[in-house]
Design a protein with these regions (language model features):
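Phosphate/adenylate-binding glycine loop and adjacent helical scaffold
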Residues: 1-202
Length: 202
């Protein structure tokens, strides 16, 4: 699978070149164009109905479209539903946490889950519904507006407003907190922020 991101950063398209037999999964409605050799099938979450329900609670559809190159190479072009950018993240038996609605596409072996213990409760206080993308392969996340990647060394920290975080690697430590008291929140225009500590990438 070869990929290219075009028209960045405001109207990004994800162009996926598939070898015969290769597949890419995508959110319903993401397809812009595809080659005649590419077939489309719609399937529910790979983990069954329970995980499908969890994905819906995480802001994602319970279904995904499966694009497969049949017999010869093919190309699929995907795009987010709103103007914005797309980030390509390559997982190697790792986890990427993403906010609700950020998932665009992935390799077929990537597991998508929104139920992972206390983390869900913690992030719900920040107005975020977490989604865990796990496994090995390509993952593509999208956001309204431009996307910036920040890499942390071990012990390095950064503070991000909860409205501006899209995803973080599973090895990054993070917590949610309010900015001061009610007065500070009202006057500063800031409410809840996320404290991230490396190593890792957000």
């Amino acid at each position: 699978m070869d990929v290219e991101l075009t028209h960045r950063p405001s109207y990004t398209h994800l162009v996926v070149d598939l070898s015969p037999g290769e597949t890419v999964m995508a959110e319903p409605g993401a397809m812009v164009t595809h080659s005649p050799s590419v077939s489309i099938a719609t399937e529910s979450s790979r983990d069954g109905l329970v995980s499908s329900a969890k994905s819906m609670l995480g802001g994602e559809s319970a279904f995904a479209n499966q694009f497969t190159a049949e017999g010869e190479p093919g190309t699929v072009t995907l795009s987010p539903p709103t103007p914005g950018d797309v980030h390509h993240h390559d997982l190697a038996d790792e986890t990427l946490y993403a906010v609700d609605g950020a998932y665009l596409a992935s390799a077929p072996d990537i597991d998508i889950d929104s139920g992972f213990g206390g983390l869900e409760s913690m992030l719900s206080g920040a107005g975020l519904t977490p989604l865990a993308l796990k496994g090995t392969g390509n993952v593509f996340i999208e956001a309204f507006g431009g996307l910036e990647t920040i890499e942390f060394d071990h012990g390095e920290s950064h503070v991000v407003d909860n409205d501006h975080i899209v995803a973080c690697e599973g090895n990054v430590e993070f917590d949610a907190r309010r900015v001061g008291g009610l007065k500070s929140t009202l006057l500063s225009g800031e409410g809840i922020v996320m404290d991230f500590t490396g190593p890792g990438t957000i």
